[in-house]
């Protein structure tokens, strides 16, 4: 769901996991070229991903995503381009509604075909994005740089080096009430402007991936990464609230340093004549966070950093050994099974201690066994069916532990990890040049972590007892001829509380807020290698509950987009001129909801009809 709020990053939900996140990614794990884009505590973001360098994206849903460890209700693997011969330079410029610009450059190439010792491939890109924003007080700018370098060390080993850096400055327009949205979806609440709600993010990260074939049947893989992330956020919390005893102020200043290593060994063999592959490994991640809070005012001047109200150092680490196996039981029947033992430790040291704000230091440690298994049967060469089951584990993030409800001071150490059990039945069928998929699933969760309340940009969390998700997914990706492609997907997801999450009132049987019951997409594209191309897509989302009581809902919507362009191939040059219209019929709809917003400002409106045009020019040195 697109919040249209660059201060809070993109929200992604997989089978309802991630829907509670008020900023960034939550409940799912994301990897870019094998390096986590999810912090060790489970909080992720997409701001450091260069969309112009993406080669493909794979999404893993269902029980086996749990084998990736903590916060893996789903897994998204992003693979960026690998440089190839010939060397290519590319420049692109894009302009859209609301004063939006994106300019980028990219260079890629290789010194060989990657099979000989000393062969090198590279992809380097940089981009700048600026926008005034659809709503008032929603301007943003982002500078992004990425580099990927691959080296063939010898006949049996390769090394990939990765680097990225991002700087984001964004105003935060916050949410609106239903009346405000209907009167003027572009407006903001008065406090947002008074306190100049905004966020600044600086992140730098580097990683390496070493792969070696130890023998005909053995492979070694080592992934290492390290990074730092600095975040400063000014919230629109009223002055009187910030002055309460124990309240941590209206400015959040975070400094995070994180690193990790994942080492795995893969062995292929036969056991009792059954071909089997074993993969064993150890994953270690750690993060140190310095969290400070300040008043968002200085005297009568609002929207500036004032007196300190919080100062703590948080340390978390996780250590996860794991084993995965793949058994080819017969020509048609295969079994995948694995287990992971996840240990997550959290420790907080409070350095801001006063008579009215006592020492809130504390620690927590969580352990869980995470088994998963899947049985796959090949009905024929183009059709298979499978059944799978597994257990998932999701600990609170540092942010979720940082705030308690009802203006209480200190850490939310009563927040417990959520555990889930998932079963799934599905099938995949190749139809000509297309793929038809179907899946039914059920996920039962205990101690699900959900939003308790949200106030002026600050959210506290609670455990919701038991929840259940039942769903059906259908998908079709069909190629017609050489240039036509049709994609369609539909998800029916019934996500409900099974025990009380509303305090004195009963929420048993209520829908979990933030999750749509029906989601559908269809897209048709005509895309030859050169000349004219065009496409259209339709998205539907049913209504979404915005609070635990289900008293408030964001209405359903259907939006249509169209795009077209022309691509020239002239000797070594490629020119691509393109344009797009989103929300073609100018629907007034809600792009995202802020769950349990205490002031009734649940709604984050989406833009009306908007336009974009662009040009990409590349030159290949042949």
Which role does the model predict for each range below?
Residues 164, 323-325, 387, 423, ...:
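Conserved C-terminal beta-signal and adjacent last beta-strands/turns
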Residues 97-130, 135-173, 198-215, 259, ...:
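Transmembrane beta-barrel wall of Gram-negative outer-membrane proteins
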Residues 35-61:
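Short acidic/polar hinge/loop motifs at secondary-structure boundaries
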Residues 115, 209-213, 219-237, 378, ...:
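Membrane-embedded beta-barrel scaffold of Gram-negative outer-membrane proteins
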Residues 158-164, 200-353, 378, 429, ...:
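Face-selective signature of the C-terminal outer-membrane beta-barrel domain
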Residues 11-15, 28-32, 45-47, 59, ...:
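N-terminal periplasmic accessory domains that precede
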Residues 169-187, 288-295, 301, 345-354, ...:
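Surface-exposed extracellular loop regions of Gram-negative outer-membrane beta-barrel proteins
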Residues 264-267, 272, 331, 343, ...:
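Gram-negative outer-membrane beta-barrel transporters
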């Amino acid at each position: 769901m697109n919040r249209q709020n660059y201060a809070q990053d993109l929200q992604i939900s997989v089978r309802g996991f991630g829907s509670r996140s008020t900023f960034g990614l939550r409940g799912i794990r994301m990897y870019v070229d094998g390096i986590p884009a999810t912090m060790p505590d489970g909080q992720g973001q997409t701001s450091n991903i260069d969309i112009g360098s993406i080669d493909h994206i794979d999404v893993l849903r269902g029980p086996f995503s749990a084998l990736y460890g903590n916060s893996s209700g789903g897994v998204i693997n992003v693979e960026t381009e690998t440089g190839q011969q010939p060397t290519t330079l590319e420049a692109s410029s894009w302009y859209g509604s609301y004063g939006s610009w994106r300019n980028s450059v990219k260079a890629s190439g290789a010194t060989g075909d990657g099979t000989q010792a000393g062969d090198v491939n590279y992809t380097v890109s940089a981009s700048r994005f600026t926008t005034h924003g659809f709503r008032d007080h929603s301007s943003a700018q982002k500078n992004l740089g990425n580099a990927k370098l691959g080296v063939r060390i010898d006949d049996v080993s390769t090394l990939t080096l990765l680097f990225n850096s991002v700087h984001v400055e964004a105003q935060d327009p916050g949410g609106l009430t239903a009346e405000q949205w209907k009167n003027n979806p572009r407006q903001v609440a008065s406090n947002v402007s008074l306190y100049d709600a905004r966020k600044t993010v600086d992140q730098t990260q580097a990683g390496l991936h070493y792969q070696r074939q130890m023998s005909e049947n053995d492979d070694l893989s080592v992934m290492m990464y390290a990074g730092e992330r600095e975040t400063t956020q000014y919230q629109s919390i009223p002055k009187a609230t910030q002055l309460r005893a124990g309240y941590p102020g209206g400015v959040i200043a975070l400094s995070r340093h994180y690193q990790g290593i994942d080492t795995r060994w893969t062995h292929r063999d036969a056991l009792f004549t059954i071909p089997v592959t074993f993969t064993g490994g150890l994953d270690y991640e750690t993060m140190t966070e310095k969290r400070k809070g300040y008043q968002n005012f200085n005297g009568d001047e609002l929207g500036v950093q004032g007196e300190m109200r919080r100062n703590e150092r948080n340390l978390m680490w996780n250590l996860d050994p794991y084993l995965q196996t793949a058994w080819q039981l017969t020509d048609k029947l295969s079994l995948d099974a694995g287990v992971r033992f996840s240990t997550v430790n959290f420790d907080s040291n409070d350095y801001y201690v006063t008579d009215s704000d006592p020492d809130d230091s504390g620690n927590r440690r969580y352990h869980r066994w995470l088994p998963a298994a899947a049985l796959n049967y090949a009905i024929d060469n183009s059709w298979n069916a499978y059944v799978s089951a597994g257990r998932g584990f999701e600990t609170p993030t540092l942010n979720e532990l940082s705030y308690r409800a009802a203006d209480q001071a200190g850490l939310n150490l009563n927040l417990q990890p959520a555990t889930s059990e998932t079963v799934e039945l599905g099938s995949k069928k190749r139809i000509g040049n297309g793929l038809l998929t179907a899946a039914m699933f059920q996920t039962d969760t205990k101690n699900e972590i959900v939003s308790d309340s949200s106030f002026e940009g600050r959210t506290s969390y609670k455990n919701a007892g038991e929840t259940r998700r039942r769903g059906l997914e259908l998908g079709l990706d069909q190629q017609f001829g050489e240039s036509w492609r049709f994609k369609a997907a539909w998800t029916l997801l019934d996500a409900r509380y099974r025990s009380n999450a509303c305090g004195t009132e009963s929420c048993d049987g209520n829908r979990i807020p933030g999750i749509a019951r029906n989601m559908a997409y269809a897209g048709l594209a005509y895309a030859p290698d050169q000349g004219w191309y065009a496409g259209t897509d339709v998205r539907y989302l049913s209504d979404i509950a915005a609070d635990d009581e289900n008293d408030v809902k964001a209405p359903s919507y259907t939006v249509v987009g169209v795009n077209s362009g022309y691509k020239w191939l002239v000797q070594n040059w490629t020119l691509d001129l393109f344009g797009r219209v989103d929300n073609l019929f100018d629907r007034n709809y809600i792009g995202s909801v802020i769950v349990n917003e205490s002031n009734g400002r649940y709604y984050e409106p989406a833009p009306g009809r908007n336009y974009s045009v662009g040009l990409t020019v590349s030159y290949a040195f042949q």
